[in-house]
Design a protein with these regions (language model features):
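Conserved ABC ATPase signature
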Residues: 123-127, 131
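Conserved signature/switch motifs of ABC ATPase nucleotide-binding domains
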Residues: 143, 174
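Helix-to-loop junction immediately C-terminal to a conserved catalytic motif
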Residues: 52
Length: 199
């Protein structure tokens, strides 16, 4: 859960699918947490996938991404592992040597986000959508990263849980370059971060 002073730079980035233009000549610098806002289908997920290196832009470049803590559009949890085990996958070798201590901290974090003993004992495939989302968000926050890229991390959470998750995200992200894609206006208000609009 490191904090860095790097800057994420997007330079003249464009993405087209055939004749459809998602964004064109997009340039911005992200050095603090920010919300990436646009209605569904306007390219938020595609932009994050480009920043993660999972998709190529039509043109333009990206600098300063470094190591990424990510919440994907799909949760991408290991279905046979528990929530705690999924989060522990991102522990560094140093942390893994003291994994008992860190596992207790991870468990406490999951409890704070509303996973009870029953949920903590289940494999990820049996968790609800909201429980999976909370696990994915916590995994991103535990990763040793230079940048956080979060695609709709509050999906499936009720308002009370979303507020707890947003508070944890604000506390853990610090001033690390962060892009959180959402069209949820309540989440935007809760975070209080600057908003970058697509489209």
């Amino acid at each position: 859960m490191s904090e860095t002073n790097n800057k994420l730079k997007i330079k003249s980035l464009s993405k087209r699918f055939g004749e459809k233009i998602l964004f064109e000549n997009l340039s911005l610098t992200v050095d603090d947490p920010a919300v990436l806002w646009a209605p569904s289908g306007w390219g938020k997920t595609t932009l994050l996938r480009i920043l993660m290196g999972l998709e190529a832009p039509t043109s333009g470049s990206v600098e300063g991404v470094g190591r990424v803590g990510a919440v994907f559009q799909e949760d991408r949890l290991c279905p046979q592992l528990t929530a705690e085990e999924n989060v522990a996958l991102v522990l560094t070798a140093e942390q893994y040597k003291a994994k008992t201590q860190y596992k207790e901290q991870i468990r406490d974090d999951l409890i704070q986000l509303g996973l009870d003993d029953e949920a903590l004992a289940l494999p990820a495939r049996k968790l609800s959508g909201g429980q999976k989302r909370r696990t994915a968000l916590l995994r991103a926050l535990w990763a040793e990263s230079d940048t956080l890229l979060l695609d709709e991390p509050f999906t499936g959470m009720d308002p009370a849980v979303m507020k707890k998750a947003a508070a944890m995200l604000k506390a853990r992200s610090g001033r690390k370059p962060t892009l959180l894609a959402t069209h949820d206006k309540e989440a935007i208000r809760e975070l209080g971060w600057k908003v970058i609009e697509l489209g």
